[in-house]
């Protein structure tokens, strides 16, 4: 008993997660079957009422073969007799109307699907397809079989609910509250409702029952079913599949947080089982529909004229080979998913909700099932495209000039096959390359565009000025611009101020720098304007070649003159010394640069000016900035040295006390954790007290004295309080 409890405790079970046992699985299957049978009974009644108003001029015939195909799956598996009757009805054969009174049991239901040998004679199938009397009797027998099966499932459902309540009394109420919300999106029998649209209106039997009309009717049915699968059935399955995929791939996150992010995470196993059961129903329905469409028209699809009309003959022949395996062979599309969900229905099987269990079900059951379902829908889509092309008006007009035994027709078919094969292989190869390196392809495209655009920035025009040519020859220094949302000041090297910079200034230090920066911007702007005006007034001699124009002396004189003007600027009263010092340093720097190289000095001067002028906030606020001293708040002086002391050493800080002691080793920490002790209590209180009192013989003397003193004090206080109350 203790070993079993320890084993259960070692399994990382999700908090408040619901385990999935055989009773839950059978309840899910039983509830889905009851909903389908109820909807089927309603559809059969409506189809019977629609046939009641038939006349010689207007006849409505339900397509019972396709209606019965929508009932394929483990729906009638509750009784072998009812299962056999359903198979006979699918062959358009009548059955007995005696009621089956099988004893209700809690055993597993047969989930395997079996298809009888359908007729492949097109004329015989077409004659039954338009038989009004036969379809009316099939509806009557199907209604009786449906009611009988519904009664058996109701008795089975009651027994399962009673068994569940007896086994899990504590979780019954929670299960009843969340059960319908957790799995109902996979149990809605919406495909049964399509039976109301599966009917044909006959107004003229000579034109409405021809071979071409029969093929067009099958094409319409396939198109409607394909639209339903892609638009209604698959989105629900794909959505939950993607949610499971994200949960499985997020390995670095906490496993509990991953599972709790799923919808109805406490019933994750129930939802997975319901989704797999829903996928099995869809796979069985698709296989039944493909058998009805392929077997009677197998000869038609192999006709050379039909193959010439296909968009891709190589793909069409591959589709025909797969259809031959599915419809004429022993291949069952739902065989794999049936093997996965059958163990869930076995008695005594319980699956606990763990992260590893969800990952295992996703990899072994969910992913292969969704892949098989997608491939089956694609197979139906490819068949529909080729079939529509063979029945188009353009192809019908071509049939008058083509013959089946004509040598030119057969050679054209082979030529089309070779061409379509090469095109198909090239397309598949291109898709594989795109899947392998999508990032590399996108990067190469971006790099190609960049390489095409880069040389345009370095193009040297013959009409450019000599100064520009010299700058390009020496190598222009590029200035990287910041994004427009975050403008940077190149002089202050910090983020641009807020829309109201005056309110955010803390002390007088930033006021000086901001004022100096504003004056520097204005002076540089004026200097550049004068420089540009002088440069525009100077006329270059016609006899001087472009490469020998004396710009060096002109640039040197301009830099010297403007530097002296900037150095002579002064601020308002009270701020003058700081501003004059900054401006003088700038002037001396520009003078030294101009004396070394006049041309490079001019370029550096323009570059620095552009950097300074790249601050629209300061430049725009220059006329409105008052030159007054700011404080933090009204009536509060600037911070003193006691409040904000300056560091005495550069890069020096006081070492925290915790850094003086070495950290304990990991093994010691783990050892103390296992003993449920902290690192501080590595010495017991007994040893401390014994060393303190130096009495090895008395172990608990000091400890008992301490307890005695504590009790005495507490008793003394209690006596005082009692005496006050008794006064």
From Swiss-Prot:
Its main location: cytoplasm. The keyword Protein biosynthesis does not apply. GO terms for molecular function: protein phosphatase 1 binding; protein phosphatase regulator activity. InterPro entries: GIP4. Interacts with GLC7. GLC7 phosphatase-regulatory protein involved in GLC7 subcellular redistribution and chromosome segregation. This is GLC7-interacting protein 4. It comes from Eremothecium gossypii (strain ATCC 10895 / CBS 109.51 / FGSC 9923 / NRRL Y-1056) (Yeast).
């Amino acid at each position: 008993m203790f070993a079993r409890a320890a084993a259960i405790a070692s399994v990382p079970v999700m908090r408040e997660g619901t385990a999935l046992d055989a009773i839950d699985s059978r309840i899910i299957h039983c509830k889905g079957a009851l909903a389908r049978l109820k909807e089927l009974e309603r559809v059969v009644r409506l189809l019977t009422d629609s046939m009641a108003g038939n006349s010689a001029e207007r006849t409505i015939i339900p397509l019972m073969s396709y209606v019965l195909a929508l009932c394929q799956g483990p729906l009638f598996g509750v009784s072998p007799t009812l299962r056999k009757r359903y198979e006979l009805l699918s062959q358009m054969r009548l059955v007995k109307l005696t009621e089956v009174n099988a004893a209700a049991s809690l055993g597993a239901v047969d989930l395997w699907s079996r298809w009888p040998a359908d007729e492949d004679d097109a004329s015989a199938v077409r004659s039954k397809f338009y038989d009004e009397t036969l379809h009316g009797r099939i509806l009557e027998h199907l209604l009786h079989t449906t009611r009988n099966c519904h009664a058996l499932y109701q008795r089975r459902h009651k027994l399962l609910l009673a068994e569940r309540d007896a086994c899990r009394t504590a979780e019954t109420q929670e299960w009843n509250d969340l059960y319908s919300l957790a799995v109902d999106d996979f149990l809605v029998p919406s495909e049964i409702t399509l039976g109301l649209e599966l009917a044909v209106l006959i107004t003229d039997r000579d034109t409405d029952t021809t071979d071409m009309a029969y093929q067009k009717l099958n094409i319409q049915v396939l198109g409607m079913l394909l639209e339903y699968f892609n638009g209604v059935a698959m989105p629900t399955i794909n959505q939950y599949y993607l949610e499971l995929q994200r949960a499985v791939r997020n390995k670095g996150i906490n496993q509990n947080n991953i599972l709790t992010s799923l919808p109805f995470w406490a019933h994750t196993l129930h939802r997975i089982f319901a989704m797999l059961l829903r996928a099995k129903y869809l796979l069985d329905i698709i296989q039944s529909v493909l058998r009805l469409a392929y077997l009677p028209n197998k000869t038609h699809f192999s006709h050379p004229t039909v193959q010439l009309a296909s968009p891709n003959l190589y793909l069409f022949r591959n589709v025909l080979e797969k259809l031959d395996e599915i419809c004429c062979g022993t291949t069952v599309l739902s065989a794999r998913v049936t093997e996965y969900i059958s163990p869930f229905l076995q008695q005594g099987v319980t699956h606990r909700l763990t992260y590893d269990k969800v990952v295992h079900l996703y990899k072994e059951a969910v992913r292969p099932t969704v892949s098989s379902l997608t491939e089956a829908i694609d197979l139906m889509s490819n068949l529909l495209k080729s079939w529509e092309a063979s029945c188009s008006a353009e192809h019908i007009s071509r049939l008058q000039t083509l013959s089946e035994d004509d040598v030119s027709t057969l050679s054209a078919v082979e030529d089309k096959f070779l061409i379509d094969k090469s095109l198909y292989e090239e397309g598949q190869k291109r898709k594989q390359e795109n899947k392998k390196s999508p990032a590399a392809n996108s990067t190469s495209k971006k790099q190609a565009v960049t390489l095409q655009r880069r040389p345009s920035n370095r193009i040297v025009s013959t009409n450019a000025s000599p100064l520009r040519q010299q700058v390009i020859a020496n190598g222009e220094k590029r200035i990287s611009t910041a994004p427009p949302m975050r403008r940077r000041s190149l002089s202050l090297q910090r983020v641009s101020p807020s829309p109201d910079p005056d309110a955010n200034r803390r002390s007088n230090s930033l006021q000086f720098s901001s004022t100096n920066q504003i004056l520097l911007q204005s002076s540089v702007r004026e200097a550049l304007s004068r420089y540009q005006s002088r440069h525009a007034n100077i006329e270059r001699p016609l006899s001087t070649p472009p490469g020998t124009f004396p710009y060096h002396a002109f640039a040197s004189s301009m830099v010297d003159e403007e530097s002296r003007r900037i150095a002579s600027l002064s601020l308002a009263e009270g701020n003058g010394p700081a501003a004059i010092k900054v401006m003088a340093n700038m002037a001396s720097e520009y003078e030294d640069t101009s004396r070394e190289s006049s041309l490079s000095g001019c370029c550096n001067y323009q570059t620095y000016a552009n950097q300074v002028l790249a601050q629209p906030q300061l430049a725009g606020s220059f006329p409105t900035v008052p030159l007054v001293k700011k404080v933090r708040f009204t009536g509060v002086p600037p911070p003193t040295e006691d409040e904000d002391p300056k560091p005495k050493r550069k890069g020096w800080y006081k070492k925290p006390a915790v850094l003086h002691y070495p950290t304990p080793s990991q093994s010691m920490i783990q050892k103390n954790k296992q003993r449920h002790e902290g690192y501080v209590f590595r010495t017991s209180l007994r040893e401390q007290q014994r060393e303190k009192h130096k009495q090895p013989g008395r172990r608990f003397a000091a400890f008992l004295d301490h307890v005695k003193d504590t009790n005495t004090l507490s008793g003394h206080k209690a006596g005082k309080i009692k005496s006050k109350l008794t006064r």
